[in-house]
Amino acid sequence: GSCCSLRCKVDIILKNTLNMKQITLHVYQSIDGCPVPSDKHFDAAVDASGCVLIDEETYLRIYLNHLGWPITAKETLVVTNGCIDLTENERVKFIQKDAVAELKRMKEDGDGTVVAYGEEIGALLLDNGLADEITVTTVPVLVGGGEKALECGLHDGGAWIVRSNKVQVDGKMRTVYGKV
């Protein structure tokens, strides 16, 4: 009867959750919360992921810093308002219309992991409840200025828990937060 149908509904919910892509937002910040460059841990996360999700500003910064596109083994998704394709021969896809709906579709389309990086993409993911995990790496420096490494406009009401917290050999603090 009703117990079996409840169990079936729970199983379906769990299967749907397990078959969704997991989006992990990587944030690199100074002690005072300002953005700092990513490190080898981020490179390893990119290598282990199914694809990379970034914003337009991050795309341009990566392209200009490397004088080309360094992420060739993975598909990179760039959320943008305009057409800024500097990498037409690489595995880069631009999301220009209704990014939230497109990201929700992508998230529901199978399993795997997506690594996200960039201040604007972080705000988009957090404001729309799309991030499953946040990995914050705090570098022991003071940068100063008004720019923050992680900004979001809306509070989604969801709770986050610390999954791990570790001091790295180089003095950086890496904290992984997960949704409750």
Where do the protein language model's features map onto the residues?
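Enzymes that bind and transform nitrogen-containing heteroaromatic metabolites
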Residues: L14-V180
